[in-house]
Amino acid sequence: MNKEVAIELRRITKTFGNVVANKDVDLTVYKGEILAILGENGSGKTTLMNMIAGIYYPDEGHIIVGGEEAVIKSPKDAFRYKIGMIHQHFKLVDVFTASENVILGVNDGSKYRLSDVNERVAAIAEKYGFIINPKKKIHEMSVSEKQTVEIIKVLYRGADILILDEPTAVLTPQETEKLFAVLRKMKEDGKSIIIITHKMHEVLSISDRVAVLRKGEHIATVNTAETSEAELTEMMVGKKISLNINRPEPKNPCERLVVSNISSVDSEGVQVLDDISFTAFSGEILGIAGIAGSGQRELLESIAGLYPITSGEIMYNNPASGEMENLRNKTPMQIRDLGVRLSFVPEDRLGMGLVGNMGITDNIMLRSYTRGKSVFLDRIPPKNLAKEIIKSLEVSTPDEETPVRRLSGGNVQKVLVGREIASAPSVLMAAYPVRGLDINSSYMIYNLLTQQKENGVAVIFVGEDLDVLTELCDRILVINGGKITGILDGRTAKKEEIGLLMTKHVSSAEAKEGESNAEK
């Protein structure tokens, strides 16, 4: 029996100035299936889906819904064709309840009783297996609960075609499994589910078919059961690449950074770090896992001298002098003047890491460089070093003088990582260093971090992919609500165990006990 087509794209093209986001894309989505849209950053996945959802309008091509051509120029038009999109960044009003957010923007001329809306929201939740309190305010919800509200919003409006953009990016493994269970129930109900993602293992777990995009073009659509991770990766990148992460045992580790009982509050007096203690050793990679906004950014910035702490100590064991230096509330300049060789790849690339209007060479000149072990040449002029970074990390740029703000996010990240590694650090902190990078470049960065570890550098790596954390890191520190909930051995840690700690609240005594056990 032939499958019934829910939506079909024919020769869809979309450009932004001289940039071709999508070119002659053909795609078919069937009723009652889960289709994964797979591609690297910049491959055109989100742009293509935004045209189905009415955010953009195609320059060329046709969208066919239910056998008829559809003109979709706004999200309101999309809902008329029973299409709804759940974006990666939620569009909710924090002070409203779940139900109030659900009916916000429903302009059909009807009057709504909130009690009736609450009942219908509860009925939708029960039908598909959601757990949600319709009367709960958004600011009181977890990330997964907020995502549930977004999904119910489109179901309430009658959506039969649902598009989810990176739906698991901020979820724990347990929350991801719950979401997948809900999506499978929707599929059984005849809904068409389109998932935009770059996580290969999730694609193989949840989808029926996979459509691969590369550089704005549709490469192929394959049955998930008939493909493999290696085949999909080759289609995404255009060549065969190795997806192996090398994790050698730490050699002669010694205490390099000792963080003791540090706490901090933000500008509004809200505690963002609560009695944090851990030790980073030379020759190891210490991973930091946590739901977004759990204190990862503040922790690294406090060590780098960019965020004040209210209590505690940050001690650096200087390998040159053998003396312990206290870095508490010192500025980056003061830290450097102490002879501390600390490199930092911040989460905010252009706001904190690089100067957007300056070229790569000038951004490199912002730092002083000393001879050290790295993949880059030592003691060479900044311009030559810029060329070496461009070559080694395959930075796509017209030349080394091009302002970095004109580069893509992934290329900006490569410049920043290259500059920080070239400074020959003894401590290297990297917050989401592969965010925005393609698969090939991501594994290049993982290998660079491993090389730094083998050179005796204490590497602190903040990541969001638990598979990478468990493959790359020697130990994994888990943080939630500004408090350490556990420190695990990276070689034995399970993703599910990390996920539980990411949502668990523990006492300071429990966290210290976990740290002690991890270091034994």
Regions found by a protein language model. Give the residues of each.
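Glycine-rich phosphate-binding loops of nucleotide-dependent enzymes
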Residues: 2-520
